[in-house]
Swiss-Prot record:
Keywords, alphabetical: ATP-binding, Cytoplasm, Ligase, Nucleotide-binding, RNA-binding, tRNA processing, tRNA-binding
InterPro entries listed in its UniProt record: Rossmann-like_a/b/a_fold (IPR014729), tRNA(Met)_cyd_acetate_ligase (IPR008513)
EC number assigned by the record: 6.3.4.-
Annotated residues for binding of ATP: 7-20, 101, 162, 187
Chief site of localization: cytoplasm
Reactions accelerated catalytically: cytidine(34) in elongator tRNA(Met) + acetate + ATP = N(4)-acetylcytidine(34) in elongator tRNA(Met) + AMP + diphosphate
GO molecular function (one): ligase activity, forming carbon-nitrogen bonds
Entry keyword Cytoplasm: yes
Species classification: Bacteria, Bacillati, Bacillota, Bacilli, Bacillales
Name assigned to this protein: tRNA(Met) cytidine acetate ligase
Amino acid sequence: MDSCGLIVEYNPFHNGHQYHINQARNVSNSTCIIAIMSGNFLQRGEPAIIDKFHRTKAALHGGADIVIELPYTFAVQNSDRFANGAIQTLNKFGVSSVCFGSESGSMDPFFQAYKTIKNSSEAFDNLLKDNLSDGLSFPDAATAVYETLGLTEGNLDLSKPNNILGFSYVKAIQEYAPTIKPLTIQRKNNDFHDESINGSIASATSIRKQILQSDSMDDDVHNAIPIETLHQLQSYKDKTAIWHDFEQYFPLLRYRVLTMSIKELQNIQGVVEGLEYRIQQTASDALSFVDWMHKIKTKRYTWTRIQRIFIHILTNTKKDENYVDESPSYIRILGMNKQGQQYLNYHKKNFDVPIITSIANTTHSMLAIEERATKAYYSIIPAKLQRKMFKQELQGPIII
């Protein structure tokens, strides 16, 4: 029973995601589409606009057959670590192929780029180290190396976010899961970071911006998302009275930083090179989350990198809890349909890691972090409602 894996965040699920699912099913000729989705906190260090359970429902109604969770340990990381965790998890779940969106829609440039970098690994590492020593951020340092090696020319521009992620997927497949077939489809219309909605295919960034700025869903948003996403967004807002963004966590985050010792901050995952002092010193004068970010951000420390550190502060994720280099040791199912249930029944005897449907009565260290992350995510809603929303973690997967 062939399956195709998609590495996703669905923040929120939109028409472009539905197109991706449909195209992936066609190009892979798979009977089962498996989406591995980040939980409540995302790769760029952001809270999801609605929780993972409502996003799972939207994904299942949008064509995914199974949604499994990418553990927090891998989800809130740079592109390589994010990709490594996702690919290894999908491999353990038995997928035949992985399909991702790219600028060109062709695999050849990705294979060529991987071959070039692999053959120039020593030069790549040395150039990267030199660029970082010059004070460049990791993305800028890596892009400069790509330019030096001629990898920003032609069809594959590794300065583009989707191509960077796609390349990370291909690299992870080659190194950890060579039996998986990588596939790509060409992205439609909007760029990854476009902030305005132009038509029925729009970026998740533009959809979130429109929703959060207006605190409503206007005709442009309606046109860019499936009806089930509209229902899930509205359902979450009706229950909690909010859609999540970082500004709502600002008071709690600022309080955490101001009441932590320097040593405690030093122990937070991602805090290096004295950054703990800059984070704490700027907290006192910060008037908002965005204001605080502008005070901390430097050429070396990007917005995304700082956001990831802030998420780790919210979740109290420490350096000694960094399991990112470990192989995934469980697979958690968030939801599935009948096709997904058939896939699970067909393959379950072949899995070499436990399949988890709830964090109840589990003691795994990664799941302990997941539990903290969920509690941190819901911390900005009323206490009684927090308990109710958290109970979703203890229940079985969503079945449609």
